[in-house]
Amino acid sequence: MRVPVRWVLWDVKDTLLKVRRSVGEQYCREAQQAGLQLSPAQVETAFRLAYKQKSQLLPNYGRAQGMDSQVWWTGLVRDTFGQCGVHDPALLDKLANNLYHNFCGPENWEVFSDSNSTLKSCTALGLKQGVVSNFDRRLEGILRGCGLLTHFSFIVTSEDARVAKPDPAIFSQALERCGVPASSVVHVGDHYVKDYLTSRSLGIRGYLLNRKDGQKTHLDIPPEHILQSLDELPARLQHNTD
């Protein structure tokens, strides 16, 4: 007998919302206000390299090393602008502080057109909803500013959980909050390993959101586990399709 769905867990970035402009553009806008003229493409390249290096050296915002996300992001901003020839410590700290707080605001985020309607539909089906995200502690404020926070009963961020996807332990923490068997829980996210495979490894009903090319990229996934739009989810949940 199929266990009915009781909860829906959500990834956030690139699932429910996305960065409104590229990181290179946003960093350059902040630098311009400080009198610097930099190329967005150059800053974007520098950011990607710095992010990769720092994520390998100090994964999950350096939580295992006793850091918090603001310290981690400050270091990343310094490294990014340093590659672009900006080395003034006071200026770098100012840029880092401004950018950290700027990304708390809804003006830097764009909610996908199918997010709000799908969240409302899940609530109408009697489902409770939560968040499992490799994000830092700013996420609650971002969701509030974007008008999404009220849909969720809880938020588990990797910073607060001290563990990040694809470690299944972050999903285990979310399941404890749900208080129901994993088979009664759905998870929706856009990353094949971090969201789909990891949630499925615990018995959660994982769905992979693949807005760009649907089934083409992941031929090993049953078609009924792939969403090309969040609009497809409510009907699948209503019929309890696995």
Curated annotation (Swiss-Prot):
Q: Kindly indicate where the leader peptide sits in this chain.
A: none
Note one Pfam family from the annotation. Hydrolase
Please provide, in alphabetical order, the Gene Ontology terms of the cellular component aspect for this entry. nucleus
**Stated family:** Belongs to the HAD-like hydrolase superfamily.
In terms of PANTHER family, this protein maps to: HALOACID DEHALOGENASE-LIKE HYDROLASE DOMAIN-CONTAINING PROTEIN 3, PTHR46191
The identity of this protein, by name, is: Haloacid dehalogenase-like hydrolase domain-containing protein 3
What's the source species for this entry?
A: Danio rerio
